[in-house]
Amino acid sequence: MRKLRLIAYFVLLAAPAWAEVSEVRFPIGAGGVGFLPLLVMQKYGLIEQYAKQAGINVHVRWINIGGPSVMNDALLSGSADFMAAGPPSFLTLWDRTVTSVRVKSVAAMVSMPMYLNTRADRVKKFDDIGDRDRIAVTAIKVSIPSIAMQMYARQKFGPSDVYHYDKNTVTMTHPDGVIALLSGSGAVDAHFTSPPFHQRERKDPRVRTIFTTDDVMGGSSTFSMVSTTTKFHDQNPKVFDAVLKALEEANRRIVADKKTAAEILLASNGGEKGFSVSEIVDVLNDSHVKFTTTPEKVMKYATFMHSIGSIKNQPASWKDFFFPEIQGAPGS
């Protein structure tokens, strides 16, 4: 009996302090090209495959929610284990949780620009936007387009008028923004949008692009990224590693077979209704659309947002808000 007790004692010593999760809850994101890697991960069960290789049987429950505020709430409430959003939304959440659950990013997901399109005859360049012109964006003040326009406003008008264009913005989904712009109804004068909606608008010869996020970011920048809490990262190292490897493989699959990737996007709940496979393939072939886990210019967002008071904490480096597993990448 004493021998059995000793064996049990040493088995307990060798066992981990906790078992890793058997289920991962992952919001599918807002849909579209920027969240396509998640759809590929779901389609091929990539997280499950890599977890199994690590000796863990895990079920992934994909939650059909999108939009940064909803996903932020899901992560903070414990009803989701990961979230995917753009840099401004992520940085807002990172800043809020520095002294609590410490949300950090697993990796970037997609880099691509957003485009300010108009069909107004009088608007030939961004500086022609007047006080009464309405610009459709997905979210006022904290979306990528809103931050980009704040950056431009500071360059043009100085720090005292950084929110100059906020009064011009109205909230619309990308599909509604396309309809409003192309219809000429007067509901909006411009639409700040992303692929594939940008390409759809530019097929109309009356539509021109007057500004892009690349203009203020100085080149390619991260559009979407995956995040989780420090607690999940620390308590589930094998599952975390499986998620990162699954994301990297999803990006490789998209690059290698764009037609299949386009079909996956169009077949999903987040697919773009009214688009053809060939249209989506054209978008995926665009050199400005990059499927990469390497963060690009996320630190530039952080520095700017801190400078105008949108976040309170000033990171010293992009590595301050990414987990160590991705810090070997040439990020920024």
Model segments located where?
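Extracytoplasmic/secreted proteins, especially bacterial periplasmic and envelope-associated proteins
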Residues: 42, 46, 70, 74, ...
